Amino acid sequence: MKICLLDETGAGDGALSVLAARWGLEHDENNLMALVLTPQHLELRKRDEPKLGGIFVDFLGGAMAHRRKFGGGRGEAVAKAVGIKGDYLPDVVDATAGLGRDAFVLASVGCRVRMLERNPVVAALLDDGLARGYADADIGPWLRQRLQLIHASSLTALTDITPRPQVVYLDPMFPHRQKSALVKKEMRVFQSLVGPDLDADGLLEPARQLATKRVVVKRPDYAPPLADIATPNAIVTKGHRFDIYAGTA
C-alpha cells in the first residue's frame, strides 16, 4: 500500500524502514495521507488538512483512559450488547477493529478480545498503541492477556479463526452525520484512507457461522440493518443501535 512515510524521531535508526517492510507499505512522496513516526507514537495525518492533527491509538491517556476509569464499565452499551453478565465474560472477535476503542472497553471489563484489521496502516496504528499499552506497568499485565491484534481481512479470517469466539462484534464504516469535532476529524481522515466498508454486508453470515452465541452489529441510529437483515433484538443508545443476531452453537 502506498502512503507518505515520515520519520520525525531524529533517531536515524531505520525504524521507519522496518515498519514499512513489516506492514507492506511503500513510500509515496505525493500521497495526501502520511504515516508519521514521532518521538511519542505512530500517527496518521491528512497532509492537505494539517489542522485536523494526527490520529493515533492511545490506550493509556485521553479519552480511552477516561472511559476506562470513569466510564460505565459493565454498564456500557457495548458490554451489555455482547452479553456480559455476572461471571460471564465472553470471548470476542472484533472483526472491524478500527482504532480499538470498543475492543479496549470490552478487554478492560475482563473479556478476551481478538481484533481483526485488514488495512495495513490502521493495523500499524493499532500495533503501536498495543505495544505502548503492553509496556505500561498499570494496564500492561491484563492488556497482554486480553487484547490481541490479527492483521487480516475479516471476509476471509472469519471462516478459519480458532478457537471459535462466543461473540463476533462488527462496527463497519458508515458515513456519519454527527457534527462533533472528534467524529468529523477521525471520519474525514479515516474515510480518506480506507473509504466506506462497501463489502460489509458480506460479513454478517460468516460472523453468525463463527460466533457460538451471538453477533453484535453497531450501527448509527439512522442506518439500515447490516445486509438488510432486521432483528428484533437491539440495544439502543443516543445516536447508535447495537443489533444482536444469534450465532451458531
UniProtKB/Swiss-Prot annotation:
Primary enzyme class: transferase
Cellular component per GO, a single term: cytoplasm
UniProt-listed Enzyme Commission number(s): 2.1.1.242
Sorted UniProt keywords: Cytoplasm, Methyltransferase, rRNA processing, S-adenosyl-L-methionine, Transferase
Keyword Disulfide bond: no
GO MF annotation terms: rRNA (guanine-N2-)-methyltransferase activity
Binding positions (S-adenosyl-L-methionine): 101-102, 117-118, 153-154, 171
Signal peptide: none
SUPFAM superfamilies in the cross-refs: S-adenosyl-L-methionine-dependent methyltransferases
Locations listed in the record: Cytoplasm
Reaction equations catalysed: guanosine(1516) in 16S rRNA + S-adenosyl-L-methionine = N(2)-methylguanosine(1516) in 16S rRNA + S-adenosyl-L-homocysteine + H(+)
Superkingdom to which the source organism belongs: Bacteria
Family stated for the protein in its record: Belongs to the methyltransferase superfamily. RsmJ family.
Cross-referenced HAMAP family: 16SrRNA_methyltr_J
Protein name: Ribosomal RNA small subunit methyltransferase J
Organism the protein comes from: Salmonella arizonae (strain ATCC BAA-731 / CDC346-86 / RSK2980)
